[in-house]
């Protein structure tokens, strides 16, 4: 895996947030390590008066308590908004039966709307919490948790976020908990991705950053090539999530001057 100067990376993120978000930020806090890390860094950059944390549960579980631990340890303003009535109303009015993934996407997009409603009313920016591992594999909801004004962790792999979290004082129980998108009860990232973050990051770094051949990656890591192909398929299959909508080109149909 690549070697990162973590102390300088932390300073760079803090400077970035301070430069881009001087009016303040709104952060969705899930109780996971990514949102906790973003919130800690934003507070270091802007001061606690300019950071609003929104805790938006659909389920009442340990994640809510972990999210409260983050905001209370930092002393920032926060609000707990139960999205269940909103989501259930939307689903009811849609009038079709949704599977658990589709329902999870409705939850993520509901949270996005709430974040932006607060940010607009306060003239602030929404800070996203996606990391590079999620971004490259498409492990986020399009126009949901993937939507933000700035994403301080977007160029850091999940394993690097864990390291930064430890260095800036994110509570240990949050750093060590199993990552989950919180889209349904019992859901975990690694189960859904079909691979551990440690191995995923090793493959992604070689596949995307170093542009190594699949066979060489498998040989380097001592793993079946099918594992590498699985990650490659995740990256290729989610390309549409990483770009704005496109349409056909008409350049060749335009008459000359």
From Swiss-Prot:
It catalyses: deamido-NAD(+) + NH4(+) + ATP = AMP + diphosphate + NAD(+) + H(+). Pathway: Cofactor biosynthesis; NAD(+) biosynthesis; NAD(+) from deamido-NAD(+) (ammonia route): step 1/1. Gene3D superfamilies: HUPs. ATP binds at residues 28-35, 129, 158, 180. InterPro entries: NAD/GMP_synthase, NAD_synthase, NH(3)-dep_NAD(+)_synth, Rossmann-like_a/b/a_fold. Mg(2+) binds at residues 34, 134. Pfam families: NAD_synthase (PF02540). Keywords: ATP-binding, Ligase, Magnesium, Metal-binding, NAD, Nucleotide-binding. Deamido-NAD(+) binds at residues 109, 142, 149, 240-241. GO terms for cellular component: cytoplasm. One of its GO terms (molecular function) is glutaminase activity. GO terms for biological process: NAD biosynthetic process. PANTHER family: GLUTAMINE-DEPENDENT NAD(+) SYNTHETASE, NH 3 /GLUTAMINE-DEPENDENT NAD + SYNTHETASE. Homodimer. Belongs to the NAD synthetase family. This is NH(3)-dependent NAD(+) synthetase. It comes from Pyrococcus abyssi (strain GE5 / Orsay).
């Amino acid at each position: 895996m690549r070697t990162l100067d973590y102390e300088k990376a932390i300073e760079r993120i803090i400077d970035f947030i301070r430069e881009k978000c001087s009016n303040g930020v709104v952060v969705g806090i899930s109780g996971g390590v990514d949102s906790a890390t973003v919130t800690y860094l934003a507070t270091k950059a802007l001061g606690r008066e300019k950071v609003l944390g929104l805790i938006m549960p659909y389920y009442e579980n340990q994640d809510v308590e972990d999210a409260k631990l983050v905001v209370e340890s930092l002393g920032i303003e926060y609000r707990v908004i139960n999205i269940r009535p909103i989501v259930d109303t939307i689903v009811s009015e849609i009038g079709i039966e949704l599977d658990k993934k589709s329902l999870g996407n409705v939850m993520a997009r509901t949270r996005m709307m709430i974040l932006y409603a607060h940010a607009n009313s306060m003239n602030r920016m929404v800070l996203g919490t996606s990391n590079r591992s999620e971004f490259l594999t498409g492990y986020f909801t399009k126009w949901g948790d993937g939507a933000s004004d700035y994403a301080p962790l977007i160029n850091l792999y999940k394993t690097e976020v864990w390291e930064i979290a430890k260095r800036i004082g994110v509570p240990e129980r949050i750093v060590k908990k199993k990552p989950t998108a919180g889209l349904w009860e019992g859901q975990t990232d690694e189960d859904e991705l079909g691979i551990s973050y440690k191995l995923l990051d090793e493959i992604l770094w070689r596949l995307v950053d170093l542009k190594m051949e699949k066979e060489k990656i498998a040989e380097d890591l001592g793993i079946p090539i099918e594992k590498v192909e699985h990650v490659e398929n995740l990256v290729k299959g989610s390309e549409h999530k990483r770009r704005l909508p496109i349409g056909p080109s008409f350049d060749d149909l335009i008459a000359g001057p």
